[in-house]
Amino acid sequence: MPKISGGKILPIYITGHAVLHAPAKPVTDFSGIQEIVRDMFATMFAAPGVGLAGPQIGLGLRIFVYSYTEGDTLHQGVAINPDLLIPKGVPKRQTHKQQANNSTSCDEPDREGCLSFPGYQFPLERAPQVTLSAFDENKKPFTVHATGWLARIFQHEFDHLQGTLYVDRLAQKYSGEVRQAVLNNKWGIPGKYWVPQEPKE
């Protein structure tokens, strides 16, 4: 996609805000989507992060942006009304209880963070490969076959559109740390947010 420029830096909502914990609705009106995409990229770059979903900026729509550099390759784009497929034979992402009771994994657990649970990272098992099918900001369909960290990013952002944060998927042994983080930061209630700073030139 072309170089991203412009856009407003928006508040990023923190766990407890209702839109983060409810399934997002499909995008049906593409007339103002270009501005939304610019604002989402500006906010993600300022954070900084590698992905940002609509619910994180208080927008309950099925849209996310991503930007991740792997070696000399830049993976960057917007996914609107996405579907995520884990290939047959690849273990599916596990639920909270399944991860607590199942020692088998689909890859080594890398640590994840989230702009809606800022300042913390926890290990989480993810499928090592996925296929993302979605529409871009011009309503053009596309498909991406992703592995490794790009696959992890897609799963993380897709979860946001389902009303799920990555901390909801952690193994049971981390639940105490998650609860304590929420208490310490007075999260878990509607309206909590933070605003990324404008990147310095």
Swiss-Prot record:
One Pfam family recorded for the sequence: Pep_deformylase
Active site, UniProt feature: E157
Domain of life of the native organism: Bacteria
Cofactor remark from the record: Binds 1 Fe(2+) ion.
Purpose of the protein: Removes the formyl group from the N-terminal Met of newly synthesized proteins. Requires at least a dipeptide for an efficient rate of reaction. N-terminal L-methionine is a prerequisite for activity but the enzyme has broad specificity at other positions.
Family per similarity comment: Belongs to the polypeptide deformylase family.
This protein's name: Peptide deformylase
